[in-house]
Amino acid sequence: IINNAVVFLPAKNLLYDATKDKGSRLNGNKIQTGNNTIVNGSRILASESQNSSKLWRNTPPAIERHFRSSLAYRLCLVAEGRFDGMMTLRPTWEWDVAAGNLICTEAGCDVKTQDGGNPLYNEKIPKMNGMIAGNPILVDNLLSYIK
């Protein structure tokens, strides 16, 4: 269980933090995820490789893809509502996403692994099967597209 989280981007002067059951903040101000639930046209943070047809049940959805290299920062941007969601459909080290996971969930997001499970931490192999985050309905809708 993650109880406290901080993601600091000193070059941007951005400090995201969260405490379990007490919400998420950006530079001390409460943040909340967006409310878009429609996959097509949604603004999703993902790498170019996520467009590969082998990852999707049919054709990839028509998302507006954006990229930031840091998975923690992607999660924080979704938490503050600047993007509708984020996804990485490849194995993900837990230390890259643990803080962002709590910041996201405390801002109202649902965070799931690529197979729809809840992320687990402190596992023997500290890697999880991808990650998808956004408001709960959008996450469910995105998961319905994934193989």
Where are these regions (language model features)?
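An extended, acidic
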Residues: 32-147
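DPxDG-like acidic metal-binding loop motif
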Residues: 1-27
